[in-house]
Amino acid sequence: MIKLEVCCYSVDCALTAERAGADRIELCASPSEGGLTPSYGSLRLARDRVSVPVHPIIRPRGGDFCYGAVDFDVIKHDIAQIRDMGFAGVVVGMLDEEGHIDLQRMREVMRLSGNMAVTFHRAFDMCQNPMVALSQLTQLGVARILTSGQQQNAELGLPLLRDLLQASQGPVIMAGAGVRLSNLHKFVDIGIQELHSSSGHAVPSTMRYRKAGVTMCSDSEFDEFSHYCVDGEMVEAMKNSLALVDPLVQSA
């Protein structure tokens, strides 16, 4: 069965995605930075209220994936907390200064993760040599790799995604970034078995009073009176589309 993981930036979004049929949730905070580690409150509510597997992201800051000693200490504490809370998996990744997998630190990550399934996130798309990285992550025991095929969106990355699928002897290759209803078939056609989508849209704030001339964001053009939410109807449509093509893939 082709699985759909939905990227969710709140517990409300995770519940919406679950109701719409998502197979798994990647739980994050801060959509404007591409996903950061969610708060303890979000983690606890997601654990208690969401029934499908939830894999929280571990990312202490935005920007690149080359971390200093303090950032790495934060990562280790977050992994231990998420493991002890009983989550099924975790999403993490780190590179060294030359854009290679930070093997020493990833070994520590794998040790700390215990029985959790580890997804190496889109730090993979910033690495110098994806085939070498695939081999290294395989040896580390990573369960899956979330990747756009090292392109701005996964549709542009289809050639590398195909090569990674053919080469992988362990990690699931999960396509993500710009995966939507209109292009699902392109990933299915090359044999992708797991897809990652935010399926998001902006929802206007319920606030009626809106203070003019003051923002909480450094980007004065950013609309702070809307919230990024999962579109449940879109998730449901994507799942229905995958259900139609999956039997054809299985019989091919």
Curated annotation (Swiss-Prot):
Keyword Cytoplasm among record annotations: yes
Record-linked Pfam families:
CutC (PF03932)
Query: Which keywords label this protein?
Result: Cytoplasm
Q: Name one GO molecular function term.
A: copper ion binding
Q: Where in the cell is it found?
A: Cytoplasm
Q: Which domain of life is it from?
A: Bacteria
- Would the keyword Cytoplasm be found if you checked this record's keyword annotation? yes
Q: What Gene Ontology terms describe where this protein resides (cellular component)?
A: cytoplasm
- What family does the entry list? Belongs to the CutC family.
Q: What NCBIfam families does the annotation carry?
A: PRK11572.1
Its recorded name reads PF03932 family protein CutC
Organism expressing this protein natively? Serratia proteamaculans (strain 568)
Q: Name the gene for this chain.
A: cutC
